Design a protein with these regions (language model features):
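Inter-motif core of Ras-like GTPase G domains
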Residues: 126-149
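Hydrophobic anchor at the beta1->P-loop junction of P-loop NTPases
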Residues: 7
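C-terminal lobe/tail of nucleotide-utilizing enzymes
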Residues: 160-240
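N-terminal phosphate/diphosphate-binding loop that engages ATP/GTP or pyrophosphate donors
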Residues: 4, 18-93, 97, 102-105
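Switch II (G3) loop of P-loop NTPases
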Residues: 99, 103-127
Length: 240
């Protein structure tokens, strides 16, 4: 059975892609055949191959399964704005069925699929659909990325509550240091650990060259996602 997780964040620009890259790297180290999926991405650049989003390219690079770009990111938009706005402007409606068919395809290729959302939990994809709606329909366990800074405690608790109200498990959370640790950093972290009531998967430190790093998996412990991982050798996960 393919393991599936949905990565959301307390806000935009809190390091979801950094955390997703770290999760893929950690799962790769455990021998899983991983696939990253960010079905909707805005803020992309025109290349010789067409529009390309740097977050989607990162997930493609860290996926153990060789994937085409369109398998990782079926909906790509140039302007860095909310997906429902730019998709309406361009006349390219985002369909939940397309998001799901892309996920099914990856489930057939990998045994560990990581889905990265856009923005925060309730990011709209259309006038009638949010990323939360789709994650709920797919019954995806959620991993929350918390950008550690002033205000993150409230944002994290609100998001965790919304995830649980959707009937989805909060499988774990990651602290991402989006700035050099400040005076109250340790206290923010302690409060989050005390109040989130979900497994803490690890803290990704502030690193200047973090987007280029291939060793971020060392900062995460995936055993909280599946206790069986503590004894699972790499050979236990053959190619599907």
């Amino acid at each position: 059975v393919t393991k599936r997780f949905f990565v959301t964040g307390t806000d935009t620009e809190v390091g979801k892609t950094i955390a997703s890259s770290a999760l893929l790297q950690a799962a790769n180290l455990l021998g899983f055949h991983t696939a990253g999926y960010t079905p909707v991405a805005s803020g992309s650049e025109l290349t010789g191959d067409g529009l390309r989003n740097e977050d989607a390219l990162a997930l493609q690079r860290h996926s153990r399964v060789a994937l085409r770009y369109d398998q990782v990111n079926p909906y790509t938009f140039a302007e860095p704005t909310s997906p429902h706005i730019i998709s309406a402007d361009e006349g390219r409606p985002i369909a939940a069925a397309r998001l799901s068919s892309g996920l099914r395809e990856l489930e057939g290729l990998a045994d560990w699929v990581l889905v990265e959302g856009a923005g925060g939990w309730f990011t709209p994809l259309s006038d009638s659909l949010t990323f939360a709606d789709w994650a709920q329909a797919e019954q995806l366990p959620v991993i929350l990325v918390v950008g550690v800074k002033l205000g993150c405690i409230n944002h994290a608790m609100l998001t965790a509550q919304a995830v649980r109200q959707a009937g989805l498990p909060l499988a774990g959370w990651i602290a991402n240091d989006v700035q050099p640790p400040g005076k109250r950093h340790a206290e923010y972290l302690a409060t989050l650990k005390n109040r989130l009531a979900a497994p803490f998967l690890g803290e990704i430190p502030w690193l200047a060259d973090i987007a280029q790093r291939d060793d971020l998996g060392q900062y995460l412990d995936l055993r909280a996602l599946d206790p069986a991982l503590s004894t699972a050798p790499a050979a236990a996960h053959p190619a599907p």
